[in-house]
Amino acid sequence: MRQITIRLADPSDAAALCDMHQDFMSYANTLQMPYTSRKFWEHRMSQGDQSATRLVAVIDAVVVGLLGINQNSNPRRRHVVNFGITVNKSYRGQGVGSALMQAMIDYCDNWLGIRRIELEVFANNPDGLALYEKFGFQREGIARDYAFRDGRYVDAILMSRINDQPK
């Protein structure tokens, strides 16, 4: 198995992220719109959003995955983050998602003092559900008609992981 390096994303990753999001499953299982341009990703990666942290997975100098962590700005919910993840189609099933998840959990638990990590996953994404459950996320409910995708409304499953031992 090749070594997976996790690091903070930077503006030079825009082209790789644009390419990764051209695959149907990369935008079908996220809230990204299809056909995003390189300019869109350059803008997104260069803006200094203080509430977002983006981690990338790299194999052999190629960006193969992205995980975005979004901290809640409401003072009463600063203990909460939400995240989204995408893995390049050529690298799925090779531990990239797990490496990104482990890095995110370590970052949230040991550096940010986050108590609750939450996410929404489309109900018809069994690979995503399995990955999140592998890392201790529990199902909390269903958001009916959560998003419009490929001509129809789809449900999402709400999940979270509670850190009972914040530092």
Predicted region positions:
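A short beta-loop-alpha structural element at the N-terminal edge
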Residues: 4-19
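Acetyl-CoA-dependent GNAT
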Residues: 8-11, 24-90, 101-102, 107, ...
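Conserved beta-strand-loop-alpha-helix junction that forms the acyl-donor binding cleft
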Residues: 92, 119-129, 146-150
